[in-house]
Curated annotation (Swiss-Prot):
This is Guanylate kinase. It is an enzyme of class 2 (transferase). It comes from Shouchella clausii (strain KSM-K16). Keywords: ATP-binding, Cytoplasm, Kinase, Nucleotide-binding, Transferase. It comes from the Bacteria. Residues 6-184 form the Guanylate kinase-like domain. One of its GO terms (molecular function) is ATP binding.
Length: 205
């Protein structure tokens, strides 16, 4: 009997909504979910490590990855490239393990066309004011960049309809529990299990 493939879980939302914080909290709970590391051309923030948080690339290196077809998706966001290396994602799913991608909304749209069977979760802020406060609190962006991110965030919230689920990140621990519940429910879906049990019935005949 063939092994059930893992889930591709795509978590995205506006910049500053807390995608990295939520994924970090999931990781700290030692869940069975694997984590895909994205590539980016943006500069590392304090505490970020190459190969752990991101693969930090030059524009030339990133553009070579695009040309070589090494990315599942990629997008340019506020002057920087972001993308998902494809090999690790495919190998993990084929091994029957779940993997979560923490990516920008623009990238999630591209993944949807390649992996329509993925589980797409939009992480939403409690309010736009709260989102702006979180971005300002980072202390890493200029006022112009903050305004640009807020304009983009409003456009991204309008794209919420392309997602399977919406999780409000009011409190990190609550958001984590909602995502875990979604993953559990997805593994119990009829369309994921029916083939397995039909094969079992055939073996018993």
């Amino acid at each position: 009997m063939k092994r059930e493939k893992g889930l591709l879980i795509v978590l995205s939302g506006p910049a500053g909504v807390g995608k990295g914080t939520v994924c970090g909290a999931l990781r700290n709970q030692n869940t069975a979910i694997e984590y895909s590391v994205s590539a980016t051309t943006r500069k590392p923030r304090e505490g970020e490590k190459h190969g752990v948080n991101y693969f930090f690339k030059t524009r030339e290196q990133f553009e070579q990855m695009i040309e070589d077809g090494k990315l599942l998706e990629w997008a340019e966001y506020v002057g920087n490239y972001y993308g998902t290396p494809i090999d690790y994602v495919q190998e993990t799913i084929n091994a029957g393990k779940d993997i979560i991608l923490e990516i920008e909304v623009q990238g999630a749209q591209k993944v949807r066309t390649v992996f329509p069977e993925g589980v797409f979760i939009f992480l939403a802020p409690p309010s736009l004011k709260e989102l702006r406060d979180r971005i300002v609190g980072r202390g890493t962006e200029t006022e112009d960049i903050i305004n640009e991110r807020m304009t983009v965030a409003k456009e991204e919230i309008d794209l919420m309809t392309m997602y399977d689920y919406v999780v409000e990140n009011d409190k990190v621990e609550w958001a984590v529990e909602r995502i875990k519940a979604i993953v559990t429910a997805e593994h119990c879906k009829r369309e994921r299990l029916i083939k397995k049990y039909k094969e079992l019935v055939e073996v018993e005949k």
